[in-house]
UniProtKB/Swiss-Prot annotation:
UniProt GO MF annotations: rRNA binding; structural constituent of ribosome
GO CC, any one term: cytosolic small ribosomal subunit
Cited InterPro entries: Rib_uL2_dom2, Ribosomal_eS4, Ribosomal_eS4_central_region, Ribosomal_eS4_central_sf, Ribosomal_eS4_N, S4_RNA-bd, S4_RNA-bd_sf
Species per Swiss-Prot/TrEMBL record: Pyrobaculum calidifontis (strain DSM 21063 / JCM 11548 / VA1)
Residue span(s) of domain S4 RNA-binding: 38-110
The keyword Transmembrane is annotated on this UniProt entry: no
Signal peptide: none
Any coiled-coil regions, as ranges: none
Gene name tied to this protein: rps4e
CDD domains named in the record: S4 (cd00165)
BP-aspect Gene Ontology terms: translation
Family: Belongs to the eukaryotic ribosomal protein eS4 family.
Stated name of the protein: Small ribosomal subunit protein eS4
Length: 237
């Protein structure tokens, strides 16, 4: 389907539902699903407010003024999602897409020192030729590693990926005591210490608990991402 009715767009998209017609920009096929992404044009126009109209947003994007994860993107429908790094080339402003309790996903300004760093959650692993291990990440990225390195990284772990050097900078295993953020669902944006898990037959549906001070939130394993040990490894708020 080429078009998307505004009434069928994800509820958290910051678009005018009643003004400007019935159609919204539909994200193109890419690293994030429709449910958990924003088209680049919506980011430029409705989130960052660099444009007032879709036409203006398309012009800005077509000029190569927007980078996503260090790559110039000229497709105004390109899907922007969790932990993506968005750079406004003319101004040098850099943002990261992070979970937010109020907005679901929001773009937070980050320092230039973090522009090349992107947390990636491991969604699966595959054995490939030569005994090597291929990791599959939440943004559709894949990375092949030597057997000794690949075996140490498990599904649901997080790696901090260096976008410039295309290499893993830090490995954050999923284990009790780690700091995690809720990435989907009713508790989205909550950051706390991962202190409890109740395993179920379907591992992704296992119930986990995060604690921040006296506050405890519960969600499912599929909805959390490890982001550090005592503090987040990148800025998320």
């Amino acid at each position: 389907m080429v078009h998307l009715r505004k009434s069928l767009a994800p509820y958290w998209w910051p678009i005018p539902r009643k003004a400007g017609g019935v159609w919204a920009v539909r994200p193109s096929t890419g690293p994030h699903s429709l449910e958990y992404s924003l088209p680049l044009a919506v980011v430029v126009r409705d989130v960052l407010r660099y444009a007032k109209t879709l036409r203006e947003a398309r012009y800005i994007i077509s000029r190569g003024y927007i980078k996503v994860d260090g790559v110039v993107r000229k497709d105004y429908k390109f899907p922007i999602g969790l932990m993506d790094v968005v750079e406004i080339v003319p101004t040098g402003e850099i943002y990261r897409v992070v979970p937010d309790e109020a907005k679901y996903y929001d773009l937070k300004p980050i320092p230039s020192s973090e522009a090349a760093l992107k947390p990636l959650r491991v969604e699966g692993k595959t054995a490939v030729s030569g005994g090597r291990i291929q990791l599959h990440f939440h943004d559709g990225r894949n990375l092949i590693l030597p057997p000794d390195v690949g075996r140490q990284i498990k599904t649901f772990d997080t790696v901090v990926y260096d976008l410039e050097n295309k290499a893993i900078k830090t490995h954050l295993p999923l284990r009790l005591g780690q700091l995690a953020v809720v990435t989907h669902g009713g508790n989205i944006g909550f950051v706390g210490q991962f202190f409890e898990v109740v395993w179920t037959l379907k591992r992704r549906q296992s119930v986990v608990a995060l604690r921040k001070g006296e506050e405890v939130r519960r969600t499912i394993l599929d909805y959390i991402m490890v982001i550090g040990t005592e503090a987040p490894v990148v800025k998320i708020s």
